From Swiss-Prot:
Gene Ontology terms: cellular component: extracellular region
Subcellular location: Secreted
Coiled-coil annotated spans: none
Disulfide bonds: none
Tissue expression: Expressed by the skin glands.
Top-level taxon in the UniProt lineage: Eukaryota
Name of the featured protein: Temporin-1Ca
Gene Ontology biological-process annotations: defense response to bacterium
Protein family per UniProt: Belongs to the frog skin active peptide (FSAP) family. Temporin subfamily.
Entry keyword annotation includes Secreted: yes
Its biological purpose: Antibacterial activity against Gram-positive bacterium S.aureus.
Chain positions with Leucine amide modification: 13
Keywords per UniProt: Amidation, Amphibian defense peptide, Antibiotic, Antimicrobial, Secreted
Length: 13
């Protein structure tokens, strides 16, 4: 799981 995607998910959540 890429940090970039995690950044997006945390932004959405």
């Amino acid at each position: 799981f890429l940090p970039f995607l995690a950044k997006i998910l945390t932004g959405v959540l």
